[in-house]
Regions:
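Cysteine-rich micro-motifs
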Residues: 1-13
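Short, cysteine/histidine-rich loop/knuckle motifs that typically chelate Zn2+
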Residues: 7-8, 65-69, 106
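Short, non-ligating residues that shape and space the ligands of small metal-coordination modules
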Residues: 11, 15, 74-79, 113
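Short, charged surface segments at domain edges that flank catalytic/cofactor-binding sites
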Residues: 26-64, 142-145
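Polybasic, low-complexity binding patches
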Residues: 29-30, 88-99, 109-145
Length: 167
């Protein structure tokens, strides 16, 4: 049985079939790559989305650097999402929104977070009670891959909503 009527139709049908096969191949490759991701990779991706949300939250609110109080450069890559209690010393607070705020790269990286000024401005922003609760929080939190996937999707969606509502 003939499936095409002419040479032109055969060429078109062949191109269409190849495009469909390539699309299916990309889909299966993407699924295989997702399965190969380690917990560490998921942690990095979740942290990236969380940090993006924090920067967007503080940009929309019009906040400056949490340490210096200066206006931040939102146009380039000069703003970090700085943690009050560092991820190294308090990994259980890495996804805590009270623990993370927009901060200049200078304060975050070269002044080691400028913790004294960070704390003073954090008290102004969220209050002494919440800062003390943050400092006292030693509850261990262990994130498995499914938790990290959920965190990544949650903050990706929240950042998208903030950006859409701000526009």
């Amino acid at each position: 049985m003939q499936s095409v009527c002419s040479l032109d139709c055969a060429i078109h049908s062949s191109k269409k079939a190849r495009a469909w096969a390539a699309k299916e191949d990309r889909k299966t490759t993407r699924v295989k790559l997702e399965k190969l991701k380690t917990r560490s990779t998921w942690m990095k991706e979740a942290q990236r989305e969380f940090n993006r949300y924090i920067r967007e939250r503080d940009r929309v609110a019009g906040f400056g650097c949490i340490s210096s109080g200066r206006a931040l450069d939102w146009s380039g890559n000069a703003t970090d999402a700085g943690h009050f209690r560092s991820v190294g010393s308090a990994p259980h607070l890495r996804f805590n929104e009270d623990n993370c705020h927009a901060q200049s790269k200078h304060a975050n990286r070269y002044l080691s977070g400028d913790a004294v000024n960070y704390r003073m401005r954090l008290i102004e922003r969220i209050g002494l009670e919440r800062v003390e609760a943050l400092e006292a929080d030693q509850t261990p939190r262990h994130y498995d891959i499914s938790d990290l996937k959920a965190i990544k999707e949650k903050y990706k969606k929240m950042a998208r909503e903030l950006k859409k509502n701000a526009a």
